[in-house]
Curated annotation (Swiss-Prot):
Name of the featured protein: Single-stranded DNA-binding protein
Gene Ontology terms: cellular component: nucleoid
Pfam families from the UniProt entry: SSB (PF00436)
Alphabetized UniProt keyword annotations: DNA damage, DNA recombination, DNA repair, DNA replication, DNA-binding
Gene name, Swiss-Prot/TrEMBL: ssb
GO molecular function: single-stranded DNA binding
Annotated organism of origin: Halalkalibacterium halodurans (strain ATCC BAA-125 / DSM 18197 / FERM 7344 / JCM 9153 / C-125)
Protein function: Plays an important role in DNA replication, recombination and repair. Binds to ssDNA and to an array of partner proteins to recruit them to their sites of action during DNA metabolism.
Region Disordered: start-end pairs: 103-168
Compositionally biased tracts (Polar residues): 107-117
Length: 168
């Protein structure tokens, strides 16, 4: 059997970080993922997919991602159910993220033209920010792509993105 999900989208709200009674970090967030086709009005629709990430990755997601951040998620679909306050059974489908990739330079959402030399959400404490945060050190770490500069920095043209282009 195979249960594998790969998503790329933007967060619709800031991640919500909690801790279990045993002290294990868990973060919830929702990704807006564009559908590959347009509806009858010519508009692109989006799916809003709930994601859950655990442990150190959850803390990293809460610290470095926010509403509007572009992220990649690799994981599996999981369903659960519970009885709500009215006694009705509620079914929930969510992606249990095994890996979360930060797909934009840190601070690009709020600082416009920040000069960041590292794609993937890296920081001085975590130079391989775009890699799987759940891997133990000493594992097979991959270098992030070889990007050294913002490809749009010397273009001289403003990037024109309207609110209609955003999936949230």
């Amino acid at each position: 059997m195979l249960n594998r999900v790969v998503l790329v989208g933007r967060l619709t709200r800031d991640p919500e970080l909690r801790y279990t009674p045993n002290g294990v970090a868990v973060a919830n967030f929702t990704l807006a993922v564009n559908r590959p086709f347009s509806n009858q009005q010519g508009e692109r629709e989006a799916d809003f997919i709930n994601c859950v990430v655990w442990r150190k990755q959850a803390e990293n997601v809460a610290n470095y991602l926010k509403k509007g951040s572009l992220a990649g998620v690799d994981g599996r679909i999981q369903t659960r159910s519970y009885d709500n306050n009215e006694g009705r059974r509620v079914f929930v489908t969510e992606v249990m993220a095994e890996s979360v990739q930060f797909l934009e330079p840190r601070g690009s959402q709020s600082q416009g033209g920040s000069n960041v030399d590292n794609f993937g959400g890296g920081s001085p404490n975590n130079p391989m920010g775009g890699n799987d945060f759940g891997q133990q050190s000493g594992g097979s770490g991959r270098q992030s792509g070889g990007f050294s500069e913002d490809p749009f920095a010397n273009d001289g043209k403003p990037i024109d993105i309207s609110d209609d282009d955003l999936p949230f």
